[in-house]
């Protein structure tokens, strides 16, 4: 259900360069709901990060560039390994805090929006991510630190591994 939003982010909003996946000024995309890895892999394929159609067909196959959960260092364009629900949210909060700290240390006088450290962190999170305690703790510090360079997009589809989310969650 987040595929159209991912397409919009990668093609109209995010600053990134498939020719230089490690460019320091790039925006970061974290798929906290790593089980929906195909959402990310399709965007990397369409954006030109080096994935081929055969890589997408090999989804979740041993040795493929498209494992069941995104793995940092395995597939170009993947910013962090995600698997345990909620972990991606916490990683993204850390990335946002680090970007702000790096800007303060290395580029404090550059006007807003012109520093390579002004990148934005985008997170896709599922209901299952938000049911995990780590996401609550990470969100609390993000709010306390007023991280304006972090956006979490919540896929509020009321689905969890157990059943409808109303069984265990009313937020």
Labelled PLM ranges:
Residues 1-145:
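Cofactor-binding active-site loop characterized by glycine-rich and histidine/acidic residues
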Residues 30-32, 149-156:
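Short internal beta-strands
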Residues 153-171:
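Long, well-ordered, tryptophan-enriched scaffold segments
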């Amino acid at each position: 259900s987040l595929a159209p939003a991912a397409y919009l982010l990668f093609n109209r909003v995010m600053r990134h360069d498939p020719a230089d996946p490690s460019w320091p000024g790039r925006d970061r995309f974290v798929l906290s709901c790593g089980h929906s890895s195909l959402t990310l892999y399709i965007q990397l394929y369409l954006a030109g990060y080096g994935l081929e159609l055969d890589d997408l067909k090999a989804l979740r196959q041993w040795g493929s560039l498209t494992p069941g959960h995104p793995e940092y260092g395995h597939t170009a364009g993947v910013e962090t390994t995600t698997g345990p629900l909620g972990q991606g949210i916490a990683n993204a909060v850390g990335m946002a805090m680090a970007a702000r700290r790096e800007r303060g240390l290395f580029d404090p006088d550059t006007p807003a929006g012109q520093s390579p450290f002004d990148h934005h962190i985008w997170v896709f999170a599922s209901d299952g991510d938000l049911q995990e305690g780590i996401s609550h703790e990470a969100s609390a510090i993000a709010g306390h630190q007023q991280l304006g360079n972090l956006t979490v997009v919540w896929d509020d589809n009321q689905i969890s591994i157990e059943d409808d989310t109303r069984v265990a969650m009313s937020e």
